[in-house]
């Protein structure tokens, strides 16, 4: 009995680090600003059959409607109530999405904005996505309800201007946003009620927006109030998966490690450093990636949520600066995402974006605020073209063959060791995942031609970067692995995608 009790305690302690994906699925995708009706369809027609584990959705709760500039993406990070009612859809549509995605084994993770309400400067009235009244100047949010008692004005009513002062970072206003007093049980209860409503609907977990701006103990107090996941889709006693947005590039008062007790943290150093390597800036080269992960100063793998770019830093917000790779840098981006999905470190998130007209002046995009593709503020449908790409300015990186097939690669090699590393002391590298998968990159300015140990059983394999295995045939390159596990690889430095990946399920 003692043994059983101990196991159940361990299970409880570890639950918030477990994404609760089904069938050994290992990656999630952020369908940034997508409507719930489009996500429900995408779960059924694409994400489930292609092996995606889940979707991070944009904040589902009512936000302020901003008209200057016109309907920016960041208005969704200015809540005014916890009603499920945004330009992505209403509560019925949200419930339908969660049910349909769960029914095909794809989980939903909610971007929870619980550090603050909207900016103090928003006018009083009903300029909100569901018509609820707000009076930020008087701290009135009657749809919750919150009043002046529920904010941190008595501790700090100014902006954060010193990130070396943890008190300021957590009690003052992030870019003018009214900071909630999360040490008050009333506020904790209101936040937990909102999150529990979503858990009961069937979500699997949460991204905690602006976690760095909340005290770890306050977050824990909220998490302690949360229900177990819905047993219709999750095993009894399952706790919500938690990943906290903590931007810690080093050199500030607050460290990501302070939040490990609550769940995983977003490892922003990952994309910033990998981008620098793939761009070959500062003398970095891919051969240095041999000890990628903790060896590069990243948080422990089982505490990391990793990504090449996110909705903030792909437009110069958040963290990472100019080294961040995005869909605008497609060739390098596919290499970076390929490396991420092949490497065992961290739990991976793929980005799915929309296009906007960039306008750089003095190195800054003046249009970094632009919201999703829309007609007069109504978000456009995600249409699917004949070639399986998306229309209406939705980028759908998760549908790019090279990325989609690497999501499948990660599923196939899950749990296998990082082995058979090879490099040329420059930017040609290769490694296997045990005997289940092998990947080789050429990021040099000259051709790669090498016979490498793949670790794979003998046979002919289909390269899943240049093509697909279809009905036992290969639409891309074929790789012949000998009885000694070796194969010859040739990759031109001018190839559209200068990398090759093969795995157990791509064997012909």
Swiss-Prot record:
Alphabetized Pfam families for the sequence: Alpha-amylase (PF00128), Alpha-amylase_C (PF02806)
Effect annotated for changing residue 174 to V: In A1 and B(C)
Keyword Secreted: yes
Positions carrying Pyrrolidone carboxylic acid: 16
Active site per the UniProt annotation: 209 (nucleophile), 245 (proton donor)
Record-level GO cellular component terms: extracellular space
Matching SUPFAM superfamilies: (Trans)glycosidases, Glycosyl hydrolase domain
Binding site for chloride: 207, 310, 349
Main location: secreted
Site description Transition state stabilizer, residues in chain: 312
Cofactor binding note from Swiss-Prot or TrEMBL: Binds 1 Ca(2+) ion per subunit.
Compartment(s) where it occurs, according to its Swiss-Prot or TrEMBL record: Secreted, Extracellular space
Keywords, in A-Z order: Calcium, Carbohydrate metabolism, Chloride, Disulfide bond, Glycosidase, Hydrolase, Metal-binding, Pyrrolidone carboxylic acid, Secreted, Signal
Similarity remark: Belongs to the glycosyl hydrolase 13 family.
Quaternary organization: Monomer.
The protein's name in its UniProt record: Pancreatic alpha-amylase 2a5
Gene label: Amy2a5
């Amino acid at each position: 009995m003692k043994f059983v009790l101990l196991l159940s305690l361990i299970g409880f302690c570890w639950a918030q680090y477990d994404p609760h994906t089904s069938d050994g699925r290992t990656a999630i995708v952020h369908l940034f600003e997508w409507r719930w009706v489009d996500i429900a369809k995408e779960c059924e027609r694409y994400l489930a059959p292609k092996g995606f584990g889940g979707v991070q959705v944009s904040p589902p709760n009512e936000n302020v409607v901003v008209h200057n500039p016109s309907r920016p993406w960041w208005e969704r990070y200015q809540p005014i109530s916890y009603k499920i009612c945004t330009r992505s859809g209403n509560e019925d549509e949200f419930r339908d999405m969660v049910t349909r995605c769960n029914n095909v084994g794809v989980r939903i993770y909610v971007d929870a904005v619980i550090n603050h309400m909207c900016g103090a400067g928003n006018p009083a009235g009903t300029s909100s996505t569901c018509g609820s009244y707000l009076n930020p100047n008087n701290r009135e949010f009657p749809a919750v309800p919150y009043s002046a008692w529920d904010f941190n004005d008595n501790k700090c009513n100014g902006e954060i201007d010193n990130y070396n002062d943890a008190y300021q970072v957590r009690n003052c206003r992030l870019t003018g946003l009214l900071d909630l007093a999360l040490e008050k049980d009333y506020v904790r209860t209101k936040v937990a009620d909102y999150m529990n409503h979503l858990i009961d609907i069937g979500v699997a977990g949460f991204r905690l927006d602006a976690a760095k701006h909340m005290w770890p103990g306050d977050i824990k107090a909220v998490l302690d109030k949360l229900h177990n996941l819905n047993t219709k889709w999750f095993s009894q006693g399952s706790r919500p998966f938690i990943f906290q947005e903590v931007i810690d590039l080093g050199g500030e008062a607050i460290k990501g490690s302070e939040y490990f007790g609550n769940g995983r943290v977003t490892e922003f150093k990952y994309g910033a450093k990998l981008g620098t390597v793939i761009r070959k800036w500062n003398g970095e080269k891919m051969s240095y990636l041999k000890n990628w992960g903790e060896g590069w100063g990243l948080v422990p793998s089982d505490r990391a949520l990793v990504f090449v770019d996110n909705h903030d830093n792909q437009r110069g917000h958040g963290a990472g600066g100019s080294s961040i790779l995005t869909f605008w840098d497609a060739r390098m981006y596919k290499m970076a995402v390929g490396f991420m999905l092949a490497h065992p470190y961290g739990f991976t998130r793929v980005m799915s974006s929309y296009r906007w007209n960039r306008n750089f002046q003095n190195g800054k995009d003046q249009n970094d605020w632009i919201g999703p593709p829309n007609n007069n503020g109504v978000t456009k449908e995600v249409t699917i073209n004949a070639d399986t790409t998306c229309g209406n300015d939705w980028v759908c990186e998760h549908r790019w063959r090279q990325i989609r097939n690497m999501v499948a690669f990660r599923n196939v090699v899950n749990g296998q060791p990082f082995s058979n590393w090879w490099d040329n002391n420059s930017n040609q590298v290769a490694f296997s995942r045990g005997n289940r998968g092998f990947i080789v990159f050429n990021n040099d300015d000259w051709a790669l031609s090498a016979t490498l140990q793949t670790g794979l059983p003998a046979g002919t394999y289909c390269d899943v970067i240049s093509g697909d295995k279809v009905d036992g045939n290969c639409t891309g390159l074929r790789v012949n692995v000998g009885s000694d596990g070796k194969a010859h690889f040739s990759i031109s430095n001018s190839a559209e995608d200068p990398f090759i990946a093969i795995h157990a399920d791509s064997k012909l």
